[in-house]
Amino acid sequence: KVYGRCELAAAMKRLGLDNYRGYSLGNWVCAAKFESNFNTHATNRNTDGSTDYGILQINSRWWCNDGRTPGSRNLCNIPCSALLSSDITASVNCAKKIVSGGSGMNAWVAWRNRCKGTDVQAWIRGCRL
């Protein structure tokens, strides 16, 4: 599923991401835009053999199990396929675990490079939330 901007913002808000660990909703919508272009089915293979999955491009080396990543830790205790669902609950729950680690949203390269320090509120402007 490819979410609309405001549709995704509403879903993320409903699932408790607004101001989760101090990151406003705009940060999450911005991250999803530049990680997956709002597409829940996005997958990207990395040079280390791991794969990033779903709307927030969650990595199989650490967070989920895809059965093909050597030394996978599966810290969210989920199959990576769960991160490709049109229902973003699994992705959001895993993202909460990731952002609670030491580096916060810096764990997402696209957020660090494209969203951090920008006017992220623009991503939810005009949405009925």
UniProtKB/Swiss-Prot annotation:
Keyword terms: Antimicrobial, Bacteriolytic enzyme, Disulfide bond, Glycosidase, Hydrolase, Secreted
Catalyzed chemical reaction(s): Hydrolysis of (1->4)-beta-linkages between N-acetylmuramic acid and N-acetyl-D-glucosamine residues in a peptidoglycan and between N-acetyl-D-glucosamine residues in chitodextrins
EC annotation from Swiss-Prot or TrEMBL: 3.2.1.17
Gene Ontology CC: extracellular region
Coiled-coil residue windows: none
Disulfide bond residue pairs: 6-127, 30-115, 64-80, 76-94
UniProt cross-references to InterPro entries, sorted A to Z: Glyco_hydro_22 (IPR001916), Glyco_hydro_22_CS (IPR019799), Glyco_hydro_22_lys (IPR000974), Lysozyme-like_dom_sf (IPR023346)
Active site: 35, 52
Recorded superkingdom: Eukaryota
Pfam families: Lys
GO biological process: defense response to Gram-negative bacterium; defense response to Gram-positive bacterium; killing of cells of another organism
Main function: Lysozymes have primarily a bacteriolytic function; those in tissues and body fluids are associated with the monocyte-macrophage system and enhance the activity of immunoagents.
Record PANTHER family: LYSOZYME C
Record-given protein name: Lysozyme C
Native organism: Tragopan satyra (Satyr tragopan)
Lineage: Eukaryota, Metazoa, Chordata, Craniata, Vertebrata
Gene: LYZ
